[in-house]
């Protein structure tokens, strides 16, 4: 019998399986089965999920490992977050490395990581969801055309971004936070990939900001200073290499904002956790430490209130609500939000000592009311809201009611005569 590629795996101690997905401008994937070509018989539920051929390749490597020993490593050569829960669940896979289309030169760095010449220190720039199609941002995606517009013109479609600000980790971590806190109908079945009550562990494989290394680190939030006058937040974090391999570590500074009754009444949406800034150590030998100082711009923690009065005499301004602001560090957004929950007394897998609070005594709509050059901020592009043309058409999601406002798909909408004139 002629040897096959599967047989060749028996001759190698380490098997590297590469899974790839390309993407580009106007080259994204429609989520769920809508993005799958049924004629290819790939047995996919999402184009960013595994095909049978990819499963076969991974399983062949795992089978060879079981027979001959060694390791199985899966490389994700992609720019779009894939559905990889089944790889994570495969006990025969020893490691997954997300490399992100590094190109020919970048693969020298990948080889250095695989060989152990360097320790990885990167962190994920997106949430790896179990099912992409369950996300609120996936409900309005693709070519959603007007029902009555001219099909020969180029601008014959519109996407209603009904998910509001809740994209990526700002959705998953905020809904998780509200589920733990028992608020906003967050545990309802709407948006659940399983059809049962929404549960974070059923929805997320790897969180935003998560990363691993060949060594271990301990981070300590030494102190934190909020300087409202100079509009900065400064954190000093001591990082110690507690493992046996030299490596670098990333310090991520997050903030959790107060979500108030004012916000709910005025349509101000806030993520339960958001990245403020980050820094990175030099290479630390085993046992060595370094203090990383992060100075973040406070405007990154201000929220837009489209109903607020402003210095221009119109509407729209950045605000800071009165209340407690929690600052924390962590290996990704999920660890960070758990630190905040722990500090607030919730029974979660978090470290309360890695979170520090700062209290703003009164509502602030003046600190960020003007730009750096003194121009008053105000609402812009209000006519980009479909409701400005077709009142009452769209409902935008709010964390005050996940169940009642989870996005529906807005397709085959009928454009008004005024809109048709503009489109033509």
What is each residue range found by the language model?
Residues 1-424:
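C-terminal non-catalytic regions of proteins with extracellular/luminal or membrane-system context
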């Amino acid at each position: 019998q002629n040897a096959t590629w599967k047989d060749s795996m028996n001759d190698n101690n380490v098997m590297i399986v590469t899974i790839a997905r390309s993407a580009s401008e106007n080259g994204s994937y429609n989520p769920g089965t809508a993005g799958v070509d049924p004629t290819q018989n790939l047995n996919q539920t999402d184009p960013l999920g595994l095909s049978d051929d990819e499963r076969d390749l991974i399983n062949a490597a795992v089978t060879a490992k079981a027979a001959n020993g060694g390791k199985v490593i899966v490389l994700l050569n992609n720019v779009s977050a894939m559905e990889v829960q089944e790889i994570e669940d495969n006990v025969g896979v020893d490691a997954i490395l997300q490399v992100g289309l590094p190109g020919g030169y970048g693969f020298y760095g990948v080889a250095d990581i695989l060989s152990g010449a360097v320790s990885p220190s990167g962190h994920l720039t997106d949430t790896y969801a179990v099912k992409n199609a369950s996300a609120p941002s996936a409900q309005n995606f693709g070519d959603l055309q007007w029902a009555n517009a001219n099909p020969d013109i180029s601008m014959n479609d519109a996407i209603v971004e009904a998910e509001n600000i809740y994209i990526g980790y700002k959705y998953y971590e905020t809904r998780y936070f509200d589920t733990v806190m028992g608020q906003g109908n967050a545990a309802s079945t709407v948006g659940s990939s399983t059809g049962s009550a929404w549960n974070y562990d059923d929805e997320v494989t790897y969180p935003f900001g998560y990363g691993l290394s060949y060594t271990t680190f301990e981070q300590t939030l030494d102190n934190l200073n909020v300087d409202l006058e100079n509009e900065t937040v400064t954190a000093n974090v001591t990082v110690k290499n507690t493992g046996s391999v030299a490596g670098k570590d990333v310090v991520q500074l997050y903030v959790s904002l107060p979500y108030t009754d004012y916000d709910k009444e005025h349509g101000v949406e806030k993520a339960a956790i958001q990245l403020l800034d980050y820094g990175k150590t030099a290479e630390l030998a085993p046992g060595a430490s370094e203090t990383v100082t992060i100075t973040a711009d406070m405007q990154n923690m201000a929220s837009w209130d489209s109903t607020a009065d402003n210095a221009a005499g119109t509407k729209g301004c950045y605000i800071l609500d009165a209340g407690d602001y929690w600052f924390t560090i962590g290996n990704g957004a999920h660890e960070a939000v758990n630190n905040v929950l722990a500090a607030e007394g919730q029974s979660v897998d978090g470290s309360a000592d890695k979170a520090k609070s700062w209290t703003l005594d009164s509502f602030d709509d003046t600190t960020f009311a003007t730009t750096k050059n003194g121009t008053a901020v105000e609402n812009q592009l209000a006519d980009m809201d479909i409701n400005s043309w077709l009142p009452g058409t769209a409902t935008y999601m709010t964390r005050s009611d996940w169940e009642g406002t989870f996005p529906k798909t807005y397709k085959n909408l009928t454009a008004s005569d005024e809109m048709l004139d503009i489109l033509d």
